[in-house]
Every structure is written in structure tokens, then in C-alpha cells.
Amino acid sequence: MKTVETLNEGLKREYRVTITAKDIDARVDEEVKSIAPTVRMPGFRPGKVPPNLIRKMHGAALSADALNKAIDAGVRDLMAKEKLRPALQPAVTLADGYEAGKDAELTVALEVLPEIETPSIDGLKLERLTVPADDKAVMAKIEEFAAQMKRFEEAPKTRKAATGDQVIIDFAGSVDGTPFDGGTGEDMAVEIGSGQLIPGFEDQLVGVKAGDEKTLKVTFPEDYPVETLKGKLAEFAVTVKEVKVPAATKIDDEFAKSLGLESLDKLKELMKDQVEQELNGLTRTHMKRKLLDQLAAAHDFEVPPTMVEAEFNQIWQQLEHEASHEEDPEAAKAELENDREEYRAIAVRRVRLGLLLSEIGQAHGVQVSQQEMQRLIMQAAQQYRPEDRQRFVEYVQQDALAAAQLRAPLYEDKVVDFLFEKAEITDRETTREELEAAIEADDDSGHVHGPGCGHDHDEKPAKKAAAKKPATKKEAVKDEAKAEEAPAKKAPAKKAEPKAEAKPAAAKKAAPAKAAAEEKAEPAKKAPAKKAAAKK
């Protein structure tokens, strides 16, 4: 194999690689030997077909396999010989006009990771803001949980439905006067203001009463799962059968027993544990952001453009998705476009921090153990259908990129924990409101993207405020526990999407509210309005 460097500019590298016909032909011979025992041909005993006849029968396929293996080996040898650390998968191009029996000319283009001097971890100073899980906080959590379990009771026939009420409806939908599959339903319960249905559907139910018939006009979102309905104007003929109002929930022993607990005291114990975990998550988020700020301020180096572009695309797709669900999607997208470069700067910061954390972790022997990795895989597999879980496990075990995507958030957290141990930490007790305000002031997202990340985590930049433009762009508060559970997006046999019925209930928001038991490390929902961007 011959290699010639044709480009060395910044972090960009390009090579011309020649794989000789002799090397490729030797690999064809290896392929012939490997399949010979299984080849069957009339007139020959099993496994005794001459190699020249095997070549004649399977020549094209054998040559293609041999060429692919030669290319893979050639790229690996190039990486080892030149001591290259690719930022992403190299782009390999076979020259036009290649013919079997001739040398193969390749172009290998890539971006390499920058050479980073191992960051010093001396002198790190952090403040740890702590909030006690007092009785007031515990009761607030119980009340929040009770609100999520709210029930409704029948209202007088004359009551006009208001936001927060529940209406029971029959509906029949049509587009251009033609009914569509899944567009009809009976006795569907709709909570007005819940935001669970197609934008505009619930709002038009305000003021209806039992017995009313009304035609609702809505537009299906552009990202609606039914291809034929995306962006379509639809009409729903609705019959209101009943209006219900929220029933008061009394928090007492009986309420606790309805949840399968012995008493209200037991419920308080359970909720206190959850509040403590949630507050600990907020404390860690704040500390992590302050740590990342210190690292970012102390280091400035070139980062691979392809990594930045991948990260930027991740951010941008999420923001466009969120903008499409605003009251005025076009205005939201136009405003978003004005801030494109600020979001690109966010992507640069995230990538740089990811590289720094990776360098620190490698320099200090931070590792994700086999047992930890196995737990991650099994946790991620639970998000798939039972019959697909084993296929997912096998896929992650065989695909290095998928495994890296799964490992990255945990590895990052372990590096952060290592730095916490090395830092000088001072504790200060505060209130939840002050802690949330401190997080919001930083508005720095908890996950950064390094070379092993794969840039495919379920991290959401903060939704941009619809009415006014914020003064600064920073990162969203992130549920750190969620990132550890995000499966690699390239995994096969993904859990089947529920059949995209076209009834209004099918247009639910992408991120439904979690149950109280799943909110352990999630920042409070009542935090001040988030800023538009996610800085890292």
C-alpha cells in the first residue's frame, strides 16, 4: 500500500492511497478458501470444487468483498501509520474507472482531533448550593403529584367549558371534505389547555356545553406522523356529550391509601426521598455549569468543523421542531434565523468542552466499566419492544459508534465527578428559588459533546420565548438522568411507532410530562422562563 499526503491544513487532512492489485487478489484467494468447504457443484464432492471454478461462479461478489476489506484495512493502516485521531468517520472515495485486477486508488479525507495539552485541574473552586427538603417542599411535591392525578366530576348541563375543564366528545374529521383513516372517534375525553392535541383544537372547545355541535378547523403540524396529513387544513365535526370540572383532591390518609400506601406519613417519606434527589440534581447541575464555565474560560483552541456542524445541526433541528409548535410557527422560525450564528457559537463551545473533558478523563484514567456499560445497554433496551431488545443489545455490542453514543453521557458525568473530587468546594444553604435562579442565570446545558459522543443525545436547547427576544443566549436546564438513557439513534429494530391515527389526540407534544416518580433529578417545572439558547 502506498500513501501520499495531499492536504495538511489546520485540522484537515487528505491522503491518496494506492492498494495494489496483488493485495486485492490475495484477499480474493482468502475469500475463495473461506467459502470452499461450503460450495456445492454437480460432479464434485462437497468442499472439493476447484478454486478456479469458485472464482468463475462467484468472482464478482468475491472481488467486491475483497476490495471492501482491502479498503477497510488500508484506512486502518493509514490511521496507525500517520498516528491520526479522526474527529469523525473519514470520507473514503474510490477513484472512478476502477476495474478488477487493477490497483485501487483511494482518496481519504478527514478532520483530526486537535492536540490538546492536558488541562490543569489545580485551583478549581466551586460553590455548592444546597436546599433542605423541608416539610413545605415535600407537601408541594405531593400537591403537584395530586394535581397530575386529578379527576373530573360532572358539571351542570348549562356549564360552558373553560380552560382546565374536561369535555367528552364524538368527532369526525375530514380534509377537503373527505374523511381520513383514524379521523373519527367517540367518547374522547379532552382536557382543555392540556396541550395534548393538535394546536388550536382545544382552544376552540372553550365555551361549549353539553349537547353543542361545532365544527373545528385546525392545521396538522408539518411534522405530523401521517405523511398525507402533514400541513393539511382539516375540519372536525364535534358533538359535545358532557362537560366535567376538576374535582378537589383532599390530601390525607385516604389519598395515600388510594396510592397503595399505608398512610399520609408514608407518602411524605416517599416524596421526601424524591424531593431530595430532585434538589441534589439541581445542586449538581449548578456546580457542573460553573465547572464548565471555568474550563471554557481557560481554554481556547481550534475544533473540528465537522464536529461543530454535527452539533449545530442537532441544536438547530431541535429548535426548528420547537418553533413549529409555536402559535405562529413562521414568525418563530424567522426570529430563530436571526440568531443562527449565536447557536453556532454554542455548538463550538459544546464541542470544545467535550474534547477537554475527554482529554481530562483519559489523562486521569477515568473509565466506564464493562458492568456499567452493560447496565446502560440493558436500560436503553427497555425502551424497545420486548421482541426487539436482544437485537438492540447485539447491535450496540457490535457497533462502536452506537456504543460510544450510549457511553458518552456516563463517561462525561464520571469525569465531572472526578473534577468535583479535586475541586475546593464551599457549601452554602439556599432556597430552591435562588438555586433555580442561579441555574437560569447561567442557563448552561449539562451535556457536552466529545469525540466519542456521536452527537445524538436527547438534549434539548431551551425553547425561545415567543413574545420577546432574550438579552443573552445560553443553554437549557437539562434533565441529566435523561441523557444517560438516550439510546443510539442508529439502532435497528426500533420500538414500533404507535400507529399514527389521524384523530386529534394523535398530535400529542413530543415531550409529555413525566410522572412524579420519574422527576428525580429534573429541575423544577416552575423555573423562570428559559432563555432562547443552550450555551454549553
UniProtKB/Swiss-Prot annotation:
Q: Which Gene3D superfamilies match?
A: 3.10.50.40, Trigger factor ribosome-binding domain, Trigger factor, C-terminal domain
Pull one GO CC term from this UniProt entry. cytoplasm
**Signal peptide (residue range):** none
The protein's Enzyme Commission number = 5.2.1.8
Compositionally skewed regions (Low complexity) per UniProt: 503-515
Bias kind Basic and acidic residues: ranges: 472-502, 516-525
Q: Would the keyword Magnesium be found if you checked this record's keyword annotation?
A: no
Q: Where is this region: Disordered?
A: 439-536
* Domain of life where this protein originates: Bacteria
Arranged from A to Z, the UniProt key words for this protein are:
Cell cycle, Cell division, Chaperone, Cytoplasm, Isomerase, Rotamase
Cellular localisation: Cytoplasm
Location (main, coarse): cytoplasm
Q: Name one GO molecular function term.
A: ribosome binding
Record domain PPIase FKBP-type: where? 164-249
Q: Which reaction does it catalyse?
A: [protein]-peptidylproline (omega=180) = [protein]-peptidylproline (omega=0)
Q: What is known of its domains?
A: Consists of 3 domains; the N-terminus binds the ribosome, the middle domain has PPIase activity, while the C-terminus has intrinsic chaperone activity on its own.
Please name the NCBIfam families in this protein's record.
tig
Function (record text): Involved in protein export. Acts as a chaperone by maintaining the newly synthesized protein in an open conformation. Functions as a peptidyl-prolyl cis-trans isomerase.
Hey, which family's this protein in?
A: Belongs to the FKBP-type PPIase family. Tig subfamily.
Name used for this protein in its record = Trigger factor
Q: Which organism is it from?
A: Sphingopyxis alaskensis (strain DSM 13593 / LMG 18877 / RB2256)
Name of encoding gene: tig
